[in-house]
Amino acid sequence: MQFIAASIAAGIAAFGASIGNGMVISKTLEGMARQPEMAGTLRGTMFIGVGLIEAVPILSVVVAFMLMSR
């Protein structure tokens, strides 16, 4: 039962991160289309945001492995 719970938790975290990444990237592209001169700044900020969003599923996978090793 622990394996199922851990895999569901990791899957939900990955799903949430993919939705979040899509929203961040789409808004960044909208901003680049409106202000092309800010493209470099927006791109750098986007990479930082995507990195922070991706930290959540990575941590959930680590927690899932910790739960499975009990």
Swiss-Prot record:
GO terms for molecular function: lipid binding; proton-transporting ATP synthase activity, rotational mechanism. Keywords: ATP synthesis, Cell membrane, CF(0), Hydrogen ion transport, Ion transport, Lipid-binding, Membrane, Transmembrane, Transmembrane helix, Transport. SUPFAM superfamilies: F1F0 ATP synthase subunit C (SSF81333). It is found in: Cell membrane. The keyword Membrane applies. One of its GO terms (cellular component) is plasma membrane. The chain crosses the membrane at residues 3-23, 47-67. InterPro entries: ATP_synth_csu_bac/chlpt (IPR005953), ATP_synth_F0_csu (IPR000454), ATP_synth_F0_csu_DDCD_BS (IPR020537), ATP_synth_F0_csu_sf (IPR038662), ATPase_proteolipid_c-like_dom (IPR002379), F/V-ATP_Csub_sf (IPR035921). It is a multi-pass membrane protein. The keyword Transmembrane helix applies. It comes from the Bacteria. CDD domains: ATP-synt_Fo_c_ATPE. NCBIfam families: ATP_synt_c (TIGR01260), PRK06876.1 (NF005363). F(1)F(0) ATP synthase produces ATP from ADP in the presence of a proton or sodium gradient. F-type ATPases consist of two structural domains, F(1) containing the extramembraneous catalytic core and F(0) containing the membrane proton channel, linked together by a central stalk and a peripheral stalk. During catalysis, ATP synthesis in the catalytic domain of F(1) is coupled via a rotary mechanism of the central stalk subunits to proton translocation. F-type ATPases have 2 components, F(1) - the catalytic core - and F(0) - the membrane proton channel. F(1) has five subunits: alpha(3), beta(3), gamma(1), delta(1), epsilon(1). F(0) has three main subunits: a(1), b(2) and c(10-14). The alpha and beta chains form an alternating ring which encloses part of the gamma chain. F(1) is attached to F(0) by a central stalk formed by the gamma and epsilon chains, while a peripheral stalk is formed by the delta and b chains. Belongs to the ATPase C chain family. This is ATP synthase subunit c. The lineage of its organism: Bacteria, Bacillati, Bacillota, Bacilli, Lactobacillales. The gene is atpE.
